Amino acid sequence: MNRLLNNPEQVVDEMLAGYIASYPDRFCKLDGYHVLLNKNEKDKVSIVIGAGGGNEPWPIGYVGEGLADACSLGNVFAAPTAKSILNAIRYVPNEKGVLCIATNHAGDVL
């Protein structure tokens, strides 16, 4: 089976970089973390999604206009770190509150 990976250790970083390069006016990355951020701040309750990265990085598709404000991704087959999620919460507009959505990932309970 062939793969489309440059380096398995960098797959989440490269995926986020490619997504941001495709939509530079809409998204940015939180430095030092696997966090995709919506650049369009809103006067609303912010939504932060936490989920594993790698094979099925579905949360990035939910970040955008009228949807989630950030997603925090873990490495391949791993949940995001608490520090990564906390920094995403701190970065998004949080005056009206933040709704956190987390998946039932095996890494969450280890």
Sequence positions of predicted segments:
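Glycine-rich oxoanion-binding loops at beta->alpha junctions
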Residues: 55, 61-95
